[in-house]
Regions:
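Hydrophobic face of amphipathic alpha-helices that form TPR/SEL1-like repeat modules
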Residues: 1-8, 12, 22, 35-44, ...
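Intrinsically disordered, low-complexity linker/propeptide segments enriched in Ser/Thr/Gly/Pro
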Residues: 1-5, 111-113, 128, 167, ...
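Short helix-capping/linker turns of helical repeat alpha-solenoids
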Residues: 8-10, 15, 23, 28-32, ...
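Intrinsically disordered, low-complexity tandem-repeat regions
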Residues: 11, 28, 35, 84, ...
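Intrinsically disordered, low-complexity repeat tracts enriched in Gly/Pro/Ser/Thr and acidic residues
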Residues: 54, 59-61, 95
């Protein structure tokens, strides 16, 4: 928690070096949120030199300890080739694991895999179901994806009123797609 306060700048200015130091202390005790945050720092180069390989190491450790955000981030790394070779099947597996905790981003990404057939056959019904679950958590990208389903009849009947409502809800949460 203290590391997070340094990160957001409790005294008015962020101190990423101090945040990294505190996250590293917590990570040494297998605190998964610290491991995941360090992974993100290394992926983005926030307060540290950007290093995709090191980011993946932190994500792996947190994912092995059950952190759903790290599991999703690891799926994204496999999907996009961040610090790893692109492997859509591994990405799909990590999104599935993270989705078991109902992490909205992972569930929405899983929906995209079903909709587009990124790691297997296209399954529009499963895509729709994933988007619905993630949208129920007020996750704007999933709300937009679900709106597209209603707009285009993907996994469901066309319902332009529902599509409009979902786009509007996403826009109210500052989604550029809403």
């Amino acid at each position: 928690n203290l590391a997070n306060l340094y990160e957001i700048g409790v005294d008015g200015e962020s101190n990423f070096a101090k945040a990294v130091e505190l996250y590293e202390e917590a990570a040494a005790m297998n605190y998964t949120r610290a491991l995941c945050n360090l992974g993100l720092y290394y992926e983005e180069g926030t307060g540290v030199e950007q290093n995709d390989k090191k980011a993946v190491e932190y994500y792996y450790k947190a994912a092995e300890l059950g952190d759903e955000v790290a599991q999703c981030n690891l799926g994204y790394c496999y999907e996009m080739g961040i610090g790893l070779e692109v492997n859509m099947q591994k990405a799909f597996e990590y999104y599935q694991i993270s989705s078991q905790s109902h992490y909205p981003r992972a569930v929405s990404n899983l929906g995209l895999f079903y909709e587009l057939g990124k790691a297997g056959p296209i399954d529009e019904q499963k895509a729709f179901e994933c988007y619905q679950i993630a949208a129920d958590s007020q996750y704007p990208p999933a709300q937009c994806n679900l709106a597209c389903c209603y707009e285009d009849g993907i996994g469901t009947d066309i319902d332009l009123q529902k599509a409009f409502e979902l786009y509007k809800a996403a826009a109210q949460r500052n989604s550029t797609r809403g």
